[in-house]
Amino acid sequence: MTLTVFQRKLVTAVTQMIPDNLNVFNAAANGAVVLGTGEVLKDVIEKMSVGLIANLVTDRNAYAPVGTPATAKVLARMLTNSVNLSAKVGPVAITKAMMAKIETNVNSVAAEIAAQATQAIMLHYLKAGIGAGKAAIESNEAAKYTQPARVDGVGGRTFPTLADFPLAASKFGDQASLIKSWFMDGVTWANFIAYQALPSAEQVFAIGDLQVMGDGLGRRFIISDAAADAMGTGNMLGLVPGAVAVTTNGLDMLAQEKGGNENIERWWQGEFDFNVAVKGYRLKASARTPIEGVRSFKLDDITTSANWELDQGQVDNAPATVQDVGAVGDVDTKGRRKTQAAQAVPTRHIKETAGVLVTLTATTAS
């Protein structure tokens, strides 16, 4: 009975703490990586992910012949291109000492474990989202920025300068101001604030090893070694609002006794599913097909840049129209049904994608 009560208390605590922390993180990080349930994300993504469609209005030739194809524009279809992943918490053995504590104060133990589980789950969400974002953006050469070589008195130091942020964001042209969230590891952040003068830096969110810092220009710096593991050493991500969506699908947790061995064992564990989508990108069919329906996607699958491509949209079948094929010649050739030229696949402008990938360059000694 005690384990049943503990399980109920644990589930209640975790399911309350995760949404609360996700909502605060979403606001603190300028909505670059949006974490939440499907209903929450649906509204957020519809508001943020479409953004400005590049070159929406263009010249038109009023004298163009029938059948002249037009270049289509593409709206972001993030959630339809999402990838489903599964993960687990534990299993963790419940020691006799912990069991005694559970029997004494079940609320305290449930709250303590829930806090640890919440932190671990959030970091896993972030690791998957940032890893997928980095891999997707890396597949697009137009979205990659390499820091220029620099010389200093020591050499071998890797950190961004204040100039690198606007220079990297300039990949987005007149939409550069959209990139206000920068993801990096703890060492990169430490070197950055040590060697650069960051105006009015202050902490706006923290849970465990994850920190979100803000500056006087409205930028957010998300520092996490867990997420940086997915990005790789010496990389930073600059993301727009709604760049990455992580849709949470609930959490199941179980605490129970197990017999049949030398001693009675007690365990607790949890499992959850979630979806990851990156604005302007999709997982290639060649990467999806061998996995879907066979096994669950793993982090390695979505953090490999070769598995991603720009979401170029789709085209309809070329329509058939009735028109006068020729002004001269046999009457039988007139009024025939003619198929128009095949439509061009819509191309996605970089401004309609998730952001930019920054590769930092180590300094050389003078």
Regions found by a protein language model. Give the residues of each.
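Helix N-cap / beta->alpha transition motif
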Residues: 88-99, 184-188, 223-226, 232-233, ...
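N-terminal "assembly arms/tails" that initiate or stabilize quaternary assembly
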Residues: 1-82, 218, 248-251, 292, ...
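Long, contiguous amphipathic alpha-helices that act as assembly "spine/axial" helices in icosahedral shell
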Residues: 76-145, 177, 182, 253-282
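Intrinsically disordered, low-complexity coil segments
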Residues: 100-109, 138-146, 150-155, 176, ...
